[in-house]
Amino acid sequence: MNDRHNDIIRIRPQIKKHQTFDNMSAEERFQNATLRPVLKLQNPLLLASFVNYAIKHKGVFFDIPIDKQMAYIENAIHKDQKFRNALKGMIIGQFTMEEYTAYTQNSSKLNKRMMNLVIARLQDQLQLLVPQVLSKTG
C-alpha cells in the first residue's frame, strides 16, 4: 500500500524552535511547518548540489574571499534559473499532496521564502562548501 503522505512526514526532522501559531500568515506557517523541515532533510543534497554547481562554473567560488562567496551563493540562486529550478525540485519533491496544493495557491511568495532559506542555509554552512569536506559529511 502506498502511504506517501505518512512516509514523507515520518522521515522529516522535527524542528522545535520554529512553531506555528494562529496569528502567523499562511506563508509563514507553511515556511515553519513544511519548508524548514524539508530543507533540513535535504541539507546534504543542497550542499552537494551547490558544490557541484560551483565546480561546473570553473571552481572560482573556492578561491574567492568569504564576503564574495556569500554574494556568489546569493547571485547563483537569484540569477541562474536552471539551478534555482533544480533546487526547487529537490524541495517540492518532498511535499505531501496537501502541501503541494497549498504551495500552488501561493507559489510566488513561497518560492521567494524557499530560495531565501536556501541562500541562508548555504551561507551559514560556508565551511562545508568544499568538495573534500562535503564528501566526508555525506
Q: What residue ranges belong to the model's regions?
A:
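Short, well-structured hydrophobic secondary-structure segments
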Residues: 32-62
